[in-house]
Amino acid sequence: MAPVFSKIGIIGAGVSGLAAAKQLAHHNPLVFEASDSIGGVWRHCSYSSTKLQSLRCDYAFSDFPWSDRDSTSFPSYTEILEYLTSYANHFDVLKFVRFNSKVVEIRFFGDREATDLTGKPGDYPTILPGHPVWEVAVQTNHSDTIEVVTPFFFFPFL
């Protein structure tokens, strides 16, 4: 019997979704993004004059500094999108993103039986006690699909 591995689902390819995908890349997560691009709220800014209200050095991934980190300017939304795109390309996380895939429902089904797990110890860290099973309904441009995923927000210190 082939090993059964949990699939990690991440909702949204904004700042947090990209960071989670990078941290969980060794588990091949599936990122559901409702739109056709990354960036979350920064992609859909209503005003071209929108800027971050923090300095760029305070709004950066710890392992991917801004190229002009010491600038005292407040980045525009286009600069933030460029930064997020550079981050996603640098860490090769776009391959995990399923664009135009809106999560419309999530249901908890309970625990799988321990006999369902045949992976080696250490293949996957315990996220929750037991072996939870979730069903995620995703609406795409083509059809509705179901993915079984395990939540990721229970990892400390992502």
Q: What would you call each of these model-derived segments?
A:
Residues L30-F32, Y59, R98, F153:
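Hydrophobic/aromatic beta-strand patches that form the interior of the parallel beta-sheet core
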Residues V4-K7, A25-H27, I38, C57, ...:
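Core residues of folded domains in eukaryotic genome-function proteins
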Residues S35-Y87, G110:
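Glycine-rich active-site loop/strand segments that organize a redox cofactor
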Residues P3-V31:
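N-terminal Rossmann-like FAD-binding beta1-loop-alpha1 element of flavoenzymes
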Residues T72-F153:
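Feature captures the FAD/FMN-dependent oxidoreductase FAD-binding
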Residues F155-L158:
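Flavin (primarily FAD) binding-site architecture
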Residues M1, S16, S37, T50, ...:
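Surface-exposed, flexible loop/turn segments at secondary-structure boundaries
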